[in-house]
Amino acid sequence: MKKILLMLLLCLAVVSCGKKDEVTDEVTEASTTQAQDYGVPNPFEIVDTLDEAAKIAGFSLEAPIEYADYNSLVIQAIADDMIEVIYFDAEKTHEGLRIRKAVGTDDISGDYNEYKEENVVKVGELEVTEKGNDGNISIASWTDGTYSYSINVDEALLNADDISNLISNIK
């Protein structure tokens, strides 16, 4: 009787070990397949200067080299489409704002939140749409008929006068 029980235990051990390997193989294959399905490539190419960005985008952008305490820039471009300048503090831990320019007349802000305040104002000859809350502007967007522009404000606090002054330095 002991021999039969021992043989039965050995058979169960062999069978259960074999099953474990098959499950592991299936999980590994599923993980490999899932890894291939995720991720969208970043279309932006980070560069050192606005001139380099202009070569990639096919047009130029004039923008301030700093704004208030945000004097560390990340400049990036999408081929034949957009230039973006992101203004960080010196430690690059806080984003103040970002400026974008792209071909066309569509809204390129990428911000589709709803705000309490939305106004269309004149800055020189430009009609600028400003969106924000409590007197602080979060988004300013405009077009010159050929290019679209936007200012997305993150941690910097900008009012209408600040935005107007900033827009006058962007081309």
Ranges and model annotations:
Residues 2-7:
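Sec-dependent signal peptide recognition
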Residues 13-16:
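C-terminal motif of bacterial Sec signal peptides marking the signal peptidase cleavage site
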Residues 18-20:
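Bacterial signal peptide processing site
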Residues 24, 28-33:
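Intrinsically disordered, low-complexity serine/threonine-rich repeat tracts
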Residues 35-137, 144:
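Short, solvent-exposed recognition patches
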Residues 143-151:
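Short helix/strand-capping connector loops at secondary-structure junctions
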Residues 153-171:
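Surface-exposed amphipathic alpha-helical segments
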